[in-house]
Amino acid sequence: METLICIPMIFLSEMGAYAWHRWGSHTDVLPGAKRTHDIHHAIVDDKAEGDFMYVILLLFLYFNILLILYLYTYITALMFFSMYFPVILIFFWNFYVHTAYHIENHWLNRYEWFRNDKRIHMHHHTDPTKNFGIATHYTDLLLDTFSSAFPVNSISNV
Protein backbone atom coordinates (compact mmCIF):
# COMPACT_ATOMS: atom_id res chain seq x y z
CA MET A 1 0.00 0.00 0.00
CA GLU A 2 2.71 2.45 0.99
CA THR A 3 4.58 1.89 -2.27
CA LEU A 4 1.49 2.82 -4.26
CA ILE A 5 1.38 6.15 -2.43
CA CYS A 6 4.72 7.16 -4.01
CA ILE A 7 3.22 7.44 -7.50
CA PRO A 8 0.53 10.01 -6.67
CA MET A 9 2.99 11.80 -4.38
CA ILE A 10 5.39 12.28 -7.30
CA PHE A 11 2.53 13.68 -9.38
CA LEU A 12 1.32 15.89 -6.52
CA SER A 13 4.86 17.10 -5.81
CA GLU A 14 5.27 18.23 -9.42
CA MET A 15 1.85 19.89 -9.26
CA GLY A 16 2.92 21.60 -6.03
CA ALA A 17 6.15 22.85 -7.63
CA TYR A 18 4.16 24.14 -10.60
CA ALA A 19 1.62 25.85 -8.32
CA TRP A 20 4.34 27.48 -6.23
CA HIS A 21 6.19 28.69 -9.31
CA ARG A 22 3.06 29.98 -11.05
CA TRP A 23 1.15 31.48 -8.12
CA GLY A 24 3.77 31.79 -5.36
CA SER A 25 6.78 33.12 -7.23
CA HIS A 26 4.79 35.22 -9.68
CA THR A 27 2.60 36.88 -7.05
CA ASP A 28 3.38 38.35 -3.67
CA VAL A 29 1.55 35.66 -1.67
CA LEU A 30 4.80 35.42 0.30
CA PRO A 31 6.12 38.98 0.67
CA GLY A 32 9.28 39.45 -1.39
CA ALA A 33 8.95 36.21 -3.37
CA LYS A 34 7.82 37.94 -6.57
CA ARG A 35 10.54 40.57 -6.35
CA THR A 36 13.20 37.90 -5.85
CA HIS A 37 11.81 35.82 -8.70
CA ASP A 38 11.59 38.88 -10.98
CA ILE A 39 15.33 39.35 -10.50
CA HIS A 40 15.78 35.77 -11.68
CA HIS A 41 13.60 36.45 -14.73
CA ALA A 42 15.65 39.50 -15.66
CA ILE A 43 18.59 37.19 -16.34
CA VAL A 44 18.26 35.55 -19.74
CA ASP A 45 21.75 34.11 -19.97
CA ASP A 46 22.95 30.98 -18.21
CA LYS A 47 24.72 32.57 -15.25
CA ALA A 48 21.79 32.94 -12.84
CA GLU A 49 22.45 30.01 -10.52
CA GLY A 50 23.07 32.16 -7.43
CA ASP A 51 19.68 33.84 -7.29
CA PHE A 52 17.58 30.79 -6.45
CA MET A 53 18.72 30.19 -2.87
CA TYR A 54 15.56 31.60 -1.23
CA VAL A 55 13.93 28.27 -2.08
CA ILE A 56 16.04 26.58 0.61
CA LEU A 57 14.15 28.58 3.25
CA LEU A 58 10.82 27.54 1.75
CA LEU A 59 11.98 23.93 1.68
CA PHE A 60 12.94 24.09 5.34
CA LEU A 61 9.54 25.53 6.28
CA TYR A 62 7.65 23.01 4.14
CA PHE A 63 9.43 19.97 5.55
CA ASN A 64 9.00 21.19 9.10
CA ILE A 65 5.28 21.59 8.50
CA LEU A 66 5.18 18.01 7.18
CA LEU A 67 7.07 16.81 10.23
CA ILE A 68 4.64 18.54 12.59
CA LEU A 69 1.69 17.04 10.71
CA TYR A 70 3.30 13.64 11.02
CA LEU A 71 3.84 13.98 14.75
CA TYR A 72 0.19 14.91 15.29
CA THR A 73 -1.42 12.23 13.16
CA TYR A 74 -1.64 8.45 13.18
CA ILE A 75 0.21 7.86 9.94
CA THR A 76 2.62 4.94 10.07
CA ALA A 77 6.32 5.68 9.63
CA LEU A 78 6.44 3.71 6.39
CA MET A 79 3.50 5.63 4.97
CA PHE A 80 5.03 8.91 6.10
CA PHE A 81 8.31 8.20 4.31
CA SER A 82 6.51 6.96 1.21
CA MET A 83 4.91 10.42 1.07
CA TYR A 84 7.88 12.45 2.33
CA PHE A 85 10.66 10.87 0.26
CA PRO A 86 9.12 11.50 -3.19
CA VAL A 87 8.50 15.13 -2.25
CA ILE A 88 12.15 15.55 -1.22
CA LEU A 89 13.34 13.79 -4.36
CA ILE A 90 11.18 15.91 -6.68
CA PHE A 91 12.22 19.12 -4.97
CA PHE A 92 15.93 18.39 -5.15
CA TRP A 93 15.72 17.13 -8.74
CA ASN A 94 13.91 20.34 -9.75
CA PHE A 95 16.40 22.44 -7.80
CA TYR A 96 19.39 20.62 -9.33
CA VAL A 97 18.07 20.78 -12.89
CA HIS A 98 17.06 24.43 -12.53
CA THR A 99 20.51 25.34 -11.23
CA ALA A 100 22.11 23.34 -14.05
CA TYR A 101 20.14 25.36 -16.63
CA HIS A 102 22.08 28.40 -15.45
CA ILE A 103 25.58 26.90 -15.36
CA GLU A 104 27.24 27.49 -18.70
CA ASN A 105 29.24 24.27 -19.04
CA HIS A 106 27.20 21.96 -16.84
CA TRP A 107 27.78 18.26 -17.56
CA LEU A 108 24.09 17.79 -18.46
CA ASN A 109 24.59 20.06 -21.50
CA ARG A 110 25.92 17.04 -23.41
CA TYR A 111 22.35 15.65 -23.57
CA GLU A 112 19.86 16.85 -26.16
CA TRP A 113 16.88 16.48 -23.76
CA PHE A 114 18.60 18.82 -21.32
CA ARG A 115 19.49 21.44 -23.95
CA ASN A 116 15.88 21.34 -25.15
CA ASP A 117 14.53 21.73 -21.59
CA LYS A 118 16.98 24.56 -21.02
CA ARG A 119 15.54 26.42 -24.03
CA ILE A 120 12.03 25.82 -22.72
CA HIS A 121 13.06 27.18 -19.32
CA MET A 122 14.67 30.25 -20.86
CA HIS A 123 11.48 30.88 -22.81
CA HIS A 124 9.80 31.23 -19.40
CA HIS A 125 12.31 33.98 -18.60
CA THR A 126 11.14 35.98 -21.61
CA ASP A 127 7.45 35.03 -21.35
CA PRO A 128 6.58 34.46 -17.67
CA THR A 129 3.08 33.22 -18.58
CA LYS A 130 4.48 30.02 -20.13
CA ASN A 131 6.54 26.98 -19.09
CA PHE A 132 6.29 26.99 -15.29
CA GLY A 133 7.44 23.37 -15.04
CA ILE A 134 11.12 22.97 -14.27
CA ALA A 135 12.23 19.38 -14.80
CA THR A 136 9.02 18.14 -16.41
CA HIS A 137 6.39 19.80 -18.54
CA TYR A 138 3.28 17.67 -18.03
CA THR A 139 1.86 20.25 -15.62
CA ASP A 140 2.21 22.92 -18.30
CA LEU A 141 0.57 20.61 -20.83
CA LEU A 142 -2.31 19.84 -18.43
CA LEU A 143 -2.85 23.49 -17.53
CA ASP A 144 -2.27 24.88 -21.04
CA THR A 145 0.81 26.96 -20.20
CA PHE A 146 3.31 25.01 -22.32
CA SER A 147 5.04 26.65 -25.26
CA SER A 148 7.70 25.04 -27.38
CA ALA A 149 8.41 28.27 -29.27
CA PHE A 150 11.91 29.47 -28.53
CA PRO A 151 12.58 33.19 -28.65
CA VAL A 152 15.58 34.23 -30.71
CA ASN A 153 18.65 34.81 -28.52
CA SER A 154 16.87 33.35 -25.50
CA ILE A 155 20.02 31.69 -24.24
CA SER A 156 23.66 31.63 -25.08
CA ASN A 157 25.78 28.50 -25.43
CA VAL A 158 22.96 25.97 -25.54
What are these regions, as identified by a protein language model?
Residues 1-13, 26-33, 81:
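Hydrophobic alpha-helical transmembrane segments
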Residues 11-25, 84-104:
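Transmembrane alpha-helical segments that form the membrane-embedded catalytic/substrate-channel core
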Residues 27-32, 103-158:
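Membrane-proximal soluble regions of multi-pass membrane proteins
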Residues 1-6, 67-83:
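Helix-coil boundary and interhelical linker segments in multi-pass alpha-helical membrane proteins
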Residues 51-72, 137:
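Core segments of transmembrane alpha-helices
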Residues 19-43:
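Membrane-interface helix-loop junction between the first two transmembrane segments
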Residues 21, 37, 98, 121, ...:
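Divalent metal-coordination and catalytic microenvironments
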Residues 36-48, 119-127:
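Short membrane-interface loop/juxtamembrane segments of multi-pass integral membrane proteins
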